């Protein structure tokens, strides 16, 4: 136990009682109502330390073995202050990240000589020991506010009780006393925000409506290619930079200049094929949809997530703590399967029963995810084409009296997809209508 005269810099307020007042840590979307501590980098100070103390980093004590890292400390008049942002997790806890080097607080799985766990600087991995619960508290007598950090289901509390010398007090987590810590211990766990830097946060785009399937205007009009298709923004989410791999930026630059990245979800009509089919003729056409393994692996590497076989989003450890916020912002569901969406190749036989040649263009709904920096630069994008929503437009569409007919459907390859169903034939494609195939039904529905 530290008294008011020890090297921790604790003031004469020893002996006062404290009452805890939990902060409002209800999970919120990353798109809206970010708490201030998730929008700014603050230098933390102990509330009862002498003026001039602030958060810093020190070389890890040489007596600690098998843990090559730097440890966080509260240091008097330090020349290299550390500024921290707290990224809000789905469950209301926080990842505490350092503006200078992009690393995070980590409760090291070793013990100091007083049975405390040191708080070290480490690359973000998503492990439990990097998650901290922040609770607001108030001095019972003065009413002055501060906050405390807890780990391991509130069985341990962040403390600055272990002094290396008269200038430096290491941060560590101490075991919670049965009811509440003695007041002299509580002051060692009381922190306040000091000076700050603003985080770099991109603006969220407005959502928009998806246009109808494009119509060809002549026999020579081959339709709209994917690169020229009009996109509709259906959702967007702010991604903490700690979960993003940006091949052109290191962790420090990401944290300073792209504290959050923007992930946009857009939809557009992706052209599968365009062909003139002679009157009363049948043609065989291959259709390629889904997403390739190369693209999926790229998404996993850069975002730590992938598109499931049901077109929902699946998250790995680094991103899973933010998955509810991300899917809510993107307006996309969580995947109900661990199977990755793969590439689907099908062979279709179409019959033109009209008395004239007709230009047909088939489109399927594309789901596009685009990662952007704060300045709007595109880092990368990933596209999955959804074969379950498709439609055909034709020219001329009058005086055509007979629609295009799908007479045969064969799956050539269906990688990693749990939906290997084929359409029941014959299937009529009415001009401009979207065929909607669900996972539950073999018989397609027609959008009216």
UniProtKB/Swiss-Prot annotation:
Biological-process GO terms, alphabetical: sporulation resulting in formation of a cellular spore
Disulfide bonds: 67-161
PTM info: Processed by proteases extracted from mosquito larval gut.
Superkingdom field: Bacteria
Region described as Beta-trefoil domain: 1-198
Family the entry assigns: Belongs to the toxin_10 family.
Oligomer and partners: Forms a heterodimer with BinA.
Protein name, entry field: Binary larvicide subunit BinB
Gene name, Swiss-Prot/TrEMBL: binB
Stretches for region Probable pore-forming domain: 199-448
Record's signal peptide: none
Record's subcellular location: Spore, Perispore
Gene3D superfamilies: 2.80.10.50
Molecular function terms, GO-annotated: toxin activity
Cited function: Component of a binary toxin active against Culex and some Aedes mosquito larvae; mortality towards both C.quinquefasciatus and A.atropalpus is maximal by 48 hours. A.aegypti is not very susceptible to this toxin. This subunit is responsible for localized binding to specific regions of the host larval gut. Binary toxin internalization into host gut cells requires both proteins.
Entry annotated with the keyword Disulfide bond: yes
Keyword Protease: no
Keywords, sorted A to Z: Disulfide bond, Sporulation, Toxin, Virulence
Domains (record comment): Has an N-terminal beta-trefoil domain and a C-terminal pore-forming domain. The trefoil domain has barrel and cap subdomains; the cap has 3 possible carbohydrate-binding modules while the barrel is involved in host cell receptor binding. At neutral pH the carbohydrate-binding modules are accessible on the toxin surface but the barrel subdomain is not.
């Amino acid at each position: 136990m530290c008294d008011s005269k020890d090297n921790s810099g604790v003031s004469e307020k020893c002996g006062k009682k404290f009452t805890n007042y939990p902060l409002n840590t209800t999970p919120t979307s990353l798109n809206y109502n970010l708490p201030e501590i998730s929008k700014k980098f603050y230098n933390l100070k102990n509330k009862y330390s002498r003026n001039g103390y602030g958060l810093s980093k020190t070389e890890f004590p040489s007596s600690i073995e098998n843990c090559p890292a730097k440890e966080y400390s509260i240091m008097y008049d330090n020349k290299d202050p550390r500024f921290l942002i707290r990224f809000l997790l789905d469950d209301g806890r926080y990842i505490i990240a350092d503006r200078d080097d992009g690393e995070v607080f980590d409760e090291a799985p070793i013990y100091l000589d007083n049975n405390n766990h040191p708080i070290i600087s480490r690359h973000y991995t998503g492990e439990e020991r990097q998650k901290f619960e922040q609770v607001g508290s108030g001095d019972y007598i003065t009413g002055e506010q501060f906050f405390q950090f807890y780990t391991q289901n509130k069985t341990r509390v962040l403390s600055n009780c272990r002094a290396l010398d008269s200038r430096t007090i290491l941060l560590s987590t101490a075991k919670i006393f049965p009811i509440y810590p003695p007041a002299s211990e509580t002051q060692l766990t009381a922190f306040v925000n000091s000076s700050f830097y603003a985080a770099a946060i991109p603006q969220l785009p407005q959502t928009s409506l998806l246009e109808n399937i494009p119509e060809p205007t002549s026999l020579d009009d081959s339709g709209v290619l994917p690169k020229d298709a009009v996109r509709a923004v259906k959702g967007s989410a702010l991604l903490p930079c700690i979960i993003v791999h940006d091949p052109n930026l290191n962790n420090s630059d990401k944290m300073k200049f792209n504290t959050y990245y923007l992930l946009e979800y857009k939809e557009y009509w992706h052209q599968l094929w365009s062909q003139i089919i002679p009157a009363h003729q049948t043609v065989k056409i291959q259709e390629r949809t889904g997403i390739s393994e190369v693209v999926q692996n790229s998404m996993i590497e850069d975002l730590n997530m992938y598109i499931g076989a049901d077109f929902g989003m699946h998250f790995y450890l680094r991103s899973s703590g933010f998955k509810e916020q991300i899917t809510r912002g993107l307006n996309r569901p969580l995947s109900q399967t661990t199977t990755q969406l793969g590439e689907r190749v099908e062979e279709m036989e179409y019959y033109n029963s009209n008395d004239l040649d007709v230009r047909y263009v088939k489109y399927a709904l594309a789901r596009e995810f685009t990662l952007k920096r704060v300045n709007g630069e595109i880092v990368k994008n990933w596209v999955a084409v959804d074969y379950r929503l498709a439609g055909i437009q034709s020219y001329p569409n009058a005086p055509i009296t007979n629609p295009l007919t799908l007479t045969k459907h064969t799956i050539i390859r269906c990688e990693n997809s749990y939906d290997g169903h084929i359409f029941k034939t014959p299937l009529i494609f009415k001009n401009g209508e979207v065929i909607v195939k669900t996972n539950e039904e073999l018989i397609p529905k027609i959008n009216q």
